[in-house]
Amino acid sequence: MNVLEVMKRLDDMPESYKTMSMEEMEVRVRAIKERFGKRLFIPGHHYQKDEVIQFADATGDSLQLAQVAAQNSEAEYIVFCGVHFMAETADILTGDHQKVILPDMRAGCSMADMADITQVERAWPILQELFGDTILPLTYVNSTAAIKAFVGRRGGATVTSSNAKKMVEWAFTQKERIFFLPDQHLGRNTAYELGISLDEMAVWDPHTDRLEYKGDIKKVKVILWKGHCSVHENFTVRHIEYIRRTKPDMNIIVHPECSWDVVQQADYAGSTKYIIETIRNAPSGSKWAIGTEMNLVNRLMHEHPDKEIISLNPYMCPCLTMNRIDLPHLLWALESLERGEIVNQITVPPLIAKDAAQALARMLALA
């Protein structure tokens, strides 16, 4: 069975939803939301399509949405418009009476999938042999529940792009070194901002089971997992150079999941929330080239017509896996609920959920 056949099997939505008009689907979704009332809660990630985000009861980043879902204790059903790891986090943080549903099971995250738990468990004893008991693991919330649990069992914590600096500082009060999963770029950019040189960072390659470093291994303070965001890695220094040459008065703002070179040459770098707030607070008439996911960039263009906003990469595509969540899948999930049928429920095994919750709790305690 090829990859396309596997992906198709993961999608159980009837064909009839694909031929329905947008207007009819919108009417049906609104009616279901009204009938369910507070029993239904729909979180929508910033990177979702407008056709979906219009029905979100809350918008935000992955952790923020999971927390808001947990606070809505009256909601029996959390229909999470995001990707798989986000729905897992929501399941970990919400109550036992709440059911988390992902409208399309094909909505994964390539970066989260780059840190497989088997690979991580294979790497850990090798790193322990190299450095002894001097390493604390940290994982970006953009990771699977199994990775969060691995980190939680070893005294580590999760981080977000908003609090990564604070969490790395905390980690160094616990151990001499950190093992940062799964996004090497966020880890590198954060550590560098804290004054750690590139020579004091190493990269663990899970495909060769080797540590890549320059200089003295004894001076390594940060071990970065060799993972990345497929969207943000598509912004390059050449894109920045082109903007500087053709639009010298344009501000460049990027997400810290971009490479170190890109972040260093940008005018501003920060989380999705930071980007949104920076654009919102910018003066009318200001010009911005944004290095992040295209659905969000398009939304910012629409919300701020008084500002000139473009994508840093003019040929950028939206996050393909995030884009799996569309109006037909949302409607299908909701109508299934009305029939008493729960489709695509996300359930994290209790032992994994318990350890993953510890990693999340350590971070939230420092918030």
Swiss-Prot record:
Recorded metabolic or biological pathway in which this protein acts = Cofactor biosynthesis; NAD(+) biosynthesis; quinolinate from iminoaspartate: step 1/1
Source species, domain of life: Bacteria
Protein localization: Cytoplasm
| Binding-site list for [4Fe-4S] cluster | 109, 229, 319
- Catalytic activity annotation: iminosuccinate + dihydroxyacetone phosphate = quinolinate + phosphate + 2 H2O + H(+)
Q: Kindly state which keywords UniProt assigns to this record, in alphabetical order.
A: 4Fe-4S, Cytoplasm, Iron, Iron-sulfur, Metal-binding, Pyridine nucleotide biosynthesis, Transferase
User: Which residues are listed for iminosuccinate binding in this entry?
Assistant: 45, 62, 140-142, 161, 255-257, 272
Q: What is its EC number?
A: 2.5.1.72
Please state the protein's primary subcellular location.
Answer: cytoplasm
Q: Which family does it belong to?
A: Belongs to the quinolinate synthase family. Type 3 subfamily.
Its biological purpose is as follows: Catalyzes the condensation of iminoaspartate with dihydroxyacetone phosphate to form quinolinate.
Question: What is this protein called in UniProt?
Answer: Quinolinate synthase
Q: What species does this protein belong to?
A: Geobacillus sp. (strain WCH70)
Gene that specifies this protein: nadA
